[in-house]
Each structure stands twice: as structure tokens, then as C-alpha cells.
A protein has these predicted regions:
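Conserved C-terminal active-site "lid" loop/helix of NAD(P)H-dependent oxidoreductases
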Residues: 48, 78-79, 98-117, 123-127, ...
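Amphipathic alpha-helical segments that line or abut small-molecule/effector binding pockets
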Residues: 26, 49-60, 122-129
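Conserved sequence/active-site signature of Rossmann-fold short-chain dehydrogenase/reductase
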Residues: 8-10, 51, 75
Length: 155
């Protein structure tokens, strides 16, 4: 069994604030403004609870073999920003981007073997917003992989 996860969004003890859903949500919560570069780029997403459930599902069902894409929401960056804006209440600023890359995945193969995702990108945004309001989620440097690794390597 090979699982090819899409971009994982939602809360984890070791947060990733450099992936689209989490990044845009943190911008809205921290600054009250979301900066979108381009916006037409599409990213596939899967909630962290669903990818965890999928791993458990596959362990419990070893008869399902092969390669499985795991991503259930192919959403443009602009649509993610709009959803964050509606949930959190932040302004969206669009700037040009020279990176038009888009990624999409089809996970019908997983649906056909009986796996059903339970959570959405909107759920992740709401959960992150609630944790931020409780003080349990902070915009920490080590949650931005490239910045953190660069600082760690060159300091």
C-alpha cells in the first residue's frame, strides 16, 4: 500500500504554518489580513484527521493494495482565502505571482474501496481559529519549515 497524501491541513502538535490553508488562516488570525500571491493556483488538501483515519483504515484492510492518492479538496488559493475571510473575518489582498503552478489529485480509488473523509478545509479553518482564540495556537518560527531550517543551518 502506497499512500500519496495531498497537502495536510489542520492542527498538529508540530504545526505547519507554511502550507496554504494553515498559512492563510494564521495570516488572518495574526494580522487581520490575508495576502494572496496570484490566487488561481490550485492545491489538493486533506484534513489531518482524515489522513490519520486513512492510515488506520489501510492498516485494517491490507487486502487493498496499490497506490492511492489522498486528497479530497482541490481548491484554488483564492477560494481558500475567501473561505478563511468568511470564517475569520479578515481582508484579502491579492498581489501578482510569477508562480502559476497548480496541483490536483483524484482520490476516487480510495472512495471506491470504502474510505470516506469526514472533515473539510472549512473544518480545519474553524478548528485553527478556535485554538488561536484559546491561546493554544501561536505563530511560531519553527512552524515555517524553510525559515526555520535556514535559520538553524546558518546560525
Amino acid at each position: 500500500q502506497i499512500i500519496r497524501p495531498a497537502t495536510v491541513c489542520g492542527y498538529s502538535p508540530r504545526m505547519r504554518l507554511d502550507v496554504a490553508v494553515n498559512l492563510l488562516t494564521m495570516q488572518a488570525l495574526d494580522k487581520g489580513q490575508i495576502t494572496v500571491l496570484g490566487g488561481n493556483q490550485v492545491r489538493p488538501n486533506i484534513h489531518i484527521d482524515d489522513i490519520t483515519d486513512l492510515y488506520l483504515f489501510m492498516l485494517a484492510n491490507p487486502e487493498h493494495t496499490g497506490v492511492f492518492n489522498a486528497g479530497f479538496e482541490n481548491i484554488s488559493i483564492m477560494d481558500i482565502a475567501t473561505e478563511v475571510s468568511e470564517i475569520v473575518g479578515a481582508e484579502v489582498e491579492v498581489k501578482p505571482s510569477n508562480d502559476p503552478r497548480s496541483y490536483r489529485v483524484n482520490s476516487d480509488k480510495l472512495l471506491n474501496i470504502g474510505f470516506k473523509p469526514k472533515k473539510t478545509v472549512s473544518d480545519a479553518i474553524r478548528e485553527l481559529s478556535g485554538l488561536y482564540a484559546q491561546g493554544a495556537l501561536k505563530n511560531e518560527e519553527q512552524s515555517h519549515n524553510l525559515k526555520w531550517m535556514t535559520k538553524t543551518l546558518y546560525s
